[in-house]
């Protein structure tokens, strides 16, 4: 019922919009089978728009990519692009719930002309996407709840429609209207079947028909359409209407205003066939009667006698109009039985509706009680949620505080550690600076030591050369000493020979002396010669002794020199070999040794060089003292 009130003013504007869309659909050039080709729509769209816009348009009109578009999909796509797809869904849902097939015995069930005058109800077609908003607001304003009014029993036709009648009327009017608009032209409209055979031209006469005839017609139609056992698609709507009849609470959420109902009638005259219009009028009369029944006795059951008296009174009142009095008087007698049956049937219906109302009232009270329990439960749950939120907030605050404390502690530890690391980094930087300075100094010292080592190597080479020269000189001296020995041996042999000669000469002189002593004069001269010979012999003996001593001294000196040369040669050879080994490992020592070790090695090398100088000086002095001729350079 709320859905009917939500778009109570929409079908008139919706009808005009759909008719205009029908004109556009026809202009676009549909095929004889009632479908519009997608290629045709794309070709027309490219004349007035861009490629992307045309693609979006085709996607909206043909979402399933079928290649063809019927009028229903065409309308749905246009409504979707305008932002009114929800309204179209509501209309289609009502259409699917209340549409009935067209009765086959109605030959004039065709769609009327599509020419529509905009001055029918004074409304203009809005051009914005929300073009039903004003009608909906007007319908909601006019559909406010109204209390039961004191109406005259003799004028039931003038009573306003109730919520049940408005819902039913809207459903009966909108469903065939929207169903017929979306069908092709070669198919009949989807209309509610009716058993009346009067044409639209007899509308003025039908308005004067008595309430009994109208009720009789409704009864015949109700036997076909609204029987409880009839599988009518509108049973749900009728059930809601009947359930609201017995309710003491007046609801007019689905009430259709008389202005809008007049607009519906004026609009639908161009669409519905005459029989459908007749059926709608009868339904409106039934709605008026039910509203009157509800207004006069909302909470009690109406007896059949009272209801028959009311109908008779209304019939007598309406039969006093003009030339139709005789016609109605004849029809009353023939329809008493039918009216009684219909009244009984309606009484049963009202009883059922009252029972349904009581049941719904009990259900409402039960639902209210359950709702109250649920409200209390919701309140309890809300309190529990609040308690849980409070507990969670406290726990969160406690956890946040603990995390803040831990974070502060970690920050302090981090700051302390950073300070220590910064201090350590500064110390390492200072040590690195000192080491760089030390490395530079050591490099300079290493370069100096390399230069000193080079000088020492040069001096060692010079000393080696000098030693080699000394060895050569020593060999020459040994050769010369050997020659001196040979010469001394020769001289000694010569001296021995000389001594032998002198001895023989001495013996000869002694013999000559003896010979000379024998004569007298010759004796004195021989004595002088003997004396001279003896003196010469003594001198020679002294010379021999001296030569022997010198020879002995020379031998001792030679032996001493040989021993000294041999010992010095061995010692010097050892020192030279040790120095050469140290010189060879000097580079490795420089690479691996420390500064103190390098200084000690340098001092040792200098001491070795000093000793070598002393040794060479001693050898030279010894040679100069004993045999300076050795140092003479002979060419």
Curated annotation (Swiss-Prot):
GO terms for molecular function: calcium ion binding; protein homodimerization activity; small GTPase binding. GO terms for biological process: cell division; neural retina development; positive regulation of G1 to G0 transition; regulation of cytokinesis. Residues 82-635 are annotated as: Necessary for interaction with RAB11A, subcellular location, homo- or heterooligomerization. It is a peripheral membrane protein. It comes from the Eukaryota. Residues 49-84 form the EF-hand domain. Ca(2+) binds at residues 62, 64, 68, 73. Strongly expressed in the developing retina. Expressed predominantly in neural tissues. Its main location: membrane. Homodimer. Forms a complex with Rab11 (RAB11A or RAB11B) and ARF6. Interacts with RAB11A; the interaction is direct. Forms a heterooligomeric complex with RAB11FIP2, RAB11FIP3 and RAB11FIP5. Interacts with ECPAS. This is Rab11 family-interacting protein 4.
């Amino acid at each position: 019922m709320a859905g009917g009130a939500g778009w109570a003013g929409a079908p008139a504007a919706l009808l005009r919009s759909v008719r205009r869309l029908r004109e556009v659909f026809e202009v676009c050039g549909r095929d004889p089978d009632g479908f519009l080709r997608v290629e045709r729509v794309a070709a027309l769209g490219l004349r007035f728009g861009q490629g992307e816009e045309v693609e979006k348009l085709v996607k909206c009109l043909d979402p399933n990519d079928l290649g063809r578009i019927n009028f229903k999909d065409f309308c749905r796509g246009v409504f979707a692009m305008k932002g009114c797809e929800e309204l179209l869904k509501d209309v289609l849902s009502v259409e699917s719930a209340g549409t009935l097939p067209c009765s086959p015995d109605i030959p004039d069930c065709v769609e009327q002309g599509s020419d529509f005058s905009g001055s029918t109800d004074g409304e203009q077609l809005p051009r914005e996407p929300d073009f039903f908003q004003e009608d909906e607001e007007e319908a909601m304003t006019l559909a406010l709840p109204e209390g039961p009014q004191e109406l005259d029993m003799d004028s039931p036709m003038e009573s306003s429609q109730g919520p049940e009648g408005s819902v039913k009327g809207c459903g009966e009017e909108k469903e065939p209207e929207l169903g017929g608009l979306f069908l092709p032209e070669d198919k009949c409209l989807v209309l509610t079947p009716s058993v009346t055979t009067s044409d639209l031209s007899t509308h003025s006469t039908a308005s004067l028909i008595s309430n009994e005839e109208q009720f009789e017609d409704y009864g015949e139609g109700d036997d076909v359409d609204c029987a409880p056992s009839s599988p009518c698609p509108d049973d749900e709507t009728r059930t809601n209407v009947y359930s609201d009849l017995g309710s003491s609470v007046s609801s007019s959420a689905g009430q259709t205003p008389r202005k809008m109902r007049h607009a519906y009638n004026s609009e639908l005259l161009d669409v519905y066939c005459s029989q459908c219009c007749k059926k709608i009028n009868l339904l409106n009369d039934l709605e008026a009667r039910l509203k009157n029944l509800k207004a006069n006795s909302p909470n009690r059951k109406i007896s059949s006698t009272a209801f028959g008296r009311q109908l008779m009174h209304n019939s007598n009142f309406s039969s006093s109009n003009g030339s139709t009095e005789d016609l109605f008087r004849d029809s009353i007698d023939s329809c008493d039985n039918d009216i009684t049956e219909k009244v009984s049937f309606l009484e049963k219906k009202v009883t059922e509706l009252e029972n349904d109302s009581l049941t719904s009232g009990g259900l409402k009270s039960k639902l209210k009680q359950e709702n109250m329990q649920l409200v209390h439960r919701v309140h309890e749950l809300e309190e529990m949620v609040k308690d849980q939120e409070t507990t969670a907030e406290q726990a969160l605050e406690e956890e946040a505080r603990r995390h803040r404390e831990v974070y502060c502690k970690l920050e302090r530890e981090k700051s302390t550690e950073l300070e220590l690391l910064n201090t350590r980094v500064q110390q390492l930087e200072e040590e690195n600076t000192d080491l760089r300075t030390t490395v530079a100094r050591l490099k300079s010292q290493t370069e100096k030591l390399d230069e000193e080592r080079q000088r020492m190597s040069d001096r060692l080479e010079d000393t080696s050369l000098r030693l080699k020269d000394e060895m050569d000189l020593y060999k020459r001296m040994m050769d010369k000493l050997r020659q001196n020995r040979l010469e001394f041996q020769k001289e000694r042999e010569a001296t021995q020979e000389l001594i032998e000669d002198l001895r023989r000469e001495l013996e000869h002189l002694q013999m000559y002396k003896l010979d000379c002593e024998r004569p007298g004069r010759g004796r004195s001269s021989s004595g002088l010669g003997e004396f001279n010979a003896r003196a010469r012999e003594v001198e020679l003996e002294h010379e021999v002794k001296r030569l022997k001593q010198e020879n002995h001294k020379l031998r001792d000196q030679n032996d001493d020199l040989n021993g000294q040369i041999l010992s010095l040669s061995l010692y010097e050879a050892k020192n030279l070999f040790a120095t050469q080994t140290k010189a060879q490992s000097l580079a490795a020592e420089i690479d691996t040794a420390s500064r103190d070790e390098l200084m000690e090695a340098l001092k040792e090398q200098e001491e070795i060089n000093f000793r070598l100088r002393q040794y060479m000086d001693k050898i030279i002095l010894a040679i100069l003292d004993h045999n300076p001729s050795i140092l003479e350079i002979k060419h």
